[in-house]
């Protein structure tokens, strides 16, 4: 997770469609083209994700502050099952300090650490966020999840290799 400064609702958004190109383009800009959960860029299928599951509530479904930019993998894993997460758009939620993601070895699962103090009121949200991120990086419960996990892992390995090359220069 990374901190996001979300813009105001687009003035030109007049439809009742949260998948309106205007909405998607603004979300892409606000979230720097990255999935807010796994942080990958250039993913094949994007979703407009509802931070709080809308459960057919039209107000939540169209609430600009509830719309987030996500890859289809993370969105399908989060689905309606996670609703008590750290909010990367809330300046009080120190997502970059509290959630640490570690890549150890290519064949090992990604490790996620909850660094929010145990006595902090946001600790339960940080713990739920940690659990979701672990699933988003490591789940392989179906053929689709297995292949998308491999693709995500390959991207991590590529970025890690590029980083190591830069360090050598």
Regions picked out by a protein language model, each given a short descriptive name:
Residues 16, 37-70, 78-93, 97-99:
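Histidine-centered nuclease catalytic patch
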Residues 13, 17, 21-28, 57, ...:
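Short, charged/polar micro-motifs that form catalytic or ligand-binding hotspots
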Residues 1-44:
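N-terminal, Lys/Arg-enriched amphipathic/low-complexity engagement segments
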Residues 1-8, 21-24, 72, 76-169:
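Extended charged
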Residues 9, 35, 56-59, 107:
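Residues in flexible loops and secondary-structure boundaries
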